[in-house]
């Protein structure tokens, strides 16, 4: 572009000079002239050698991306303010597909969709540039999911487990707690990383189309809990251009891939992909691409599949790293059969379905256990939890079935009453406040006490008190804590001589339930 800097935009208004400049373009295919600007889409003459997805440089430091490559013109989208450029000005093709900085120096930082810092903390020393659009790992490089990714949420870790390298969709209506579940998973990694620093899990939170105030609250929460030190936030707010909201998930993904490809572990949250799809639909319609179902373009499935396929667990020959994805999709009135939800459900390895009715009934998180599923996570679930999960799922399924019949009549037999009472107790046991992740060891002890019948005669109103007291005892009683950690270890169930530990648990549960609240344990 430097050799054309003498051509100012006011000179280009002259017809003869404009024609002369277009002749220059035939000899330099990296320079183009703006023909028109409409709704953030720029039509450019020239740029005959430009690539699809190439970064373009406009005047006033405005950047854009080439998308539609026609025989005479190129259609590009802008990443900045379109009022700062005008027809007749020149455009330069950089020759590079969009790249962003990646590396350990990004930890604790907030960046925009182009990887530029927006937290006033300076640049990223020691970082390297990576293209945002790369191919997903092949079959040979992958390994089946075999390590748990502990979220700290009882309902998920016990019933819908997530493994490192898995894609688990979080789906539900607005204001049902989707973001809270994802943030609980981020907050819980502080405890998990302290137990095993070698296999620490780094977190990337990608905010797409959210309010600036929401992102500010998120940063404050992570700073207060000292969780920002292992986290990176990629933000494309609602006020930013649609191309930036479209690009943000790919930027977050390539940042996560840096950890995966270097033998480390990362978790990426896309909150949410519905807004990315809307941004891509807006871009496609402005680019005059043919609309399809719900006015989305024909390649909307590929938009999400090529993104989510990049989450993987690599085998040891390729470093053994992993990238776990928690994409979020918003539904309208619980309709999971809409276009985007069905697309993402078919791509992912399972879904956590949040229901509005459960949320309004005070069940938090509002996970519908019957509709939620994890297709590969159970292979990575801790064996101690897995032993309990089978009984827990069965009892909750029987409870839901009995509950549906109980509403039709008041005359219930004793067995059904006991089933409903026990189901209510287990449901209350799975309740959990947001931003309070629970260590997996504590989850095991709590669920063990419920499933093995120690809370059968307990009033549901005091279960939360029991839970708090139990966790206090675990943290203060060193012998008990040792056995808890032993039980959470996969090696525990591979040993035959574990009767002493089980007997210790039983006696201790009876002590707590009998002496703390004054009721008799069975």
UniProtKB/Swiss-Prot annotation:
An example Gene Ontology cellular component term from the record?
proton-transporting ATP synthase complex
- Enumerate the transmembrane spans: none
The record ties this protein, via InterPro entries, to: ATP_synth_asu-like_sf, ATP_synth_asu_C, ATP_synth_asu_C_sf, ATP_synth_F1_a_nt-bd_dom, ATP_synth_F1_asu, ATPase_a/bsu_AS, ATPase_F1/V1/A1_a/bsu_N, ATPase_F1/V1/A1_a/bsu_N_sf
Query: What compartments host this protein?
Result: Mitochondrion; Mitochondrion inner membrane
List the PROSITE patterns: ATPASE_ALPHA_BETA (PS00152)
* Record GO terms (molecular function): ADP binding; ATP binding; proton-transporting ATP synthase activity, rotational mechanism
Residues annotated for ATP binding in this entry: 172-179
Keyword line = ATP synthesis, ATP-binding, CF(1), Hydrogen ion transport, Ion transport, Membrane, Mitochondrion, Mitochondrion inner membrane, Nucleotide-binding, Transport
Q: What is its main location?
A: mitochondrion
Q: Where does the entry annotate site (Required for activity)?
A: 372
Identify its protein family: Belongs to the ATPase alpha/beta chains family.
Subunit description: F-type ATPases have 2 components, CF(1) - the catalytic core - and CF(0) - the membrane proton channel. CF(1) has five subunits: alpha(3), beta(3), gamma(1), delta(1), epsilon(1). CF(0) has three main subunits: a, b and c.
Q: What is the role of this chain?
A: Mitochondrial membrane ATP synthase (F(1)F(0) ATP synthase or Complex V) produces ATP from ADP in the presence of a proton gradient across the membrane which is generated by electron transport complexes of the respiratory chain. F-type ATPases consist of two structural domains, F(1) - containing the extramembraneous catalytic core, and F(0) - containing the membrane proton channel, linked together by a central stalk and a peripheral stalk. During catalysis, ATP synthesis in the catalytic domain of F(1) is coupled via a rotary mechanism of the central stalk subunits to proton translocation.
- Protein name (Swiss-Prot/TrEMBL): ATP synthase subunit alpha, mitochondrial
Please name the source species. Answer: Acanthamoeba castellanii
Q: Which gene encodes it?
A: ATP1
């Amino acid at each position: 572009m430097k050799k054309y800097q003498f051509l100012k935009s006011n000179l280009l208004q002259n017809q003869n000079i404009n024609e002369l400049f277009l002749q220059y373009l035939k000899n330099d295919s990296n320079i183009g002239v703006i023909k028109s600007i409409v709704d953030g889409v720029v039509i450019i003459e020239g740029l005959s050698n430009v690539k699809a997805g190439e970064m373009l440089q406009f005047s006033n430091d405005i950047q854009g991306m080439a998308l539609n490559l026609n025989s005479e013109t190129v259609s590009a989208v802008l990443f900045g303010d379109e009022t700062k450029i005008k027809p007749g000005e020149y455009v330069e093709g950089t020759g590079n597909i969009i790249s962003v900085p990646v590396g350990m120096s990004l930890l604790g930082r907030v960046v925009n969709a182009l990887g530029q810092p927006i937290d006033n903390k300076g640049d990223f020393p020691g970082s390297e540039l990576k293209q945002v659009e790369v191919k997903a790992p092949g079959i040979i490089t992958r390994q089946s999911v075999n390590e748990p990714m502990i979220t700290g949420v009882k309902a998920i870790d016990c019933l819908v487990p997530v493994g490192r390298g898995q894609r688990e969709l979080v789906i539900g209506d607005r204001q049902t707690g989707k973001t809270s579940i994802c943030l609980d998973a981020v907050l819980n990694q502080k405890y998990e990383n302290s137990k095993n620093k070698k296999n620490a899990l780094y977190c990337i939170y990608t905010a797409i189309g959210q309010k600036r105030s929401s992102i500010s609250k998120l940063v404050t929460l992570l700073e207060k809990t000292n969780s920002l030190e292992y986290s990176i936030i990629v933000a494309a707010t609602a006020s930013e251009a649609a191309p930036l909201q479209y690009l943000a998930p790919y930027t977050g993904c390539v940042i996560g891939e840096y950890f995966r490809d270097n033998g480390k572990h990362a978790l990426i949250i896309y909150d949410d992909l519905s807004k990315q799809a809307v941004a891509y639909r807006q871009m496609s319609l402005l680019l005059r691409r043919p609309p399809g179902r719900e006015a989305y373009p024909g390649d909307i499935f590929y938009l999400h599949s090529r993104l989510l396929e990049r989450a993987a667990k690599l085998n040891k020959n390729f470093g053994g790293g992993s990238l776990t994805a928690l994409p979020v999709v918003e539904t309208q009135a619980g309709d999971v059969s809409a276009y985007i939800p069905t697309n993402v459900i078919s791509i992912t390895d399972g879904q956590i379905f949040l229901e509005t009715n459960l949320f309004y009934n005070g069940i938090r998180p509002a996970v519908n256990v019957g509709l939620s599923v994890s297709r590969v996570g159970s292979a990575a679930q801790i064996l101690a939890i897995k032993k309990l999960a089978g009984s827990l799922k069965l009892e909750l399924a029987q409870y839901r079935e009995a509950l549906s019949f109980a509403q039709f009549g008041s005359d219930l037999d004793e067995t059904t009453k006991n089933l409903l009472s026990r189901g209510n107790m287990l449901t209350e046991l799975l309740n959990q406040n947001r931003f309070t992740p629970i260590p997996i060891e504590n989850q095991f002890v709590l669920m063990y006490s419920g499933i093995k019948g120690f809370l059968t005669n307990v009033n549901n109103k005091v279960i939360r008190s029991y839970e708090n007291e139990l966790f206090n005892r675990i943290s203060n009683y060193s012998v008990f804590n040792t056995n808890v950690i032993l039980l959470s270890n996969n090696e525990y169930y591979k040993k035959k001589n574990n009767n002493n530990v089980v007997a210790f648990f039983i006696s201790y549960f009876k002590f707590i339930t009998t002496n703390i609240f004054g009721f008799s344990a069975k």
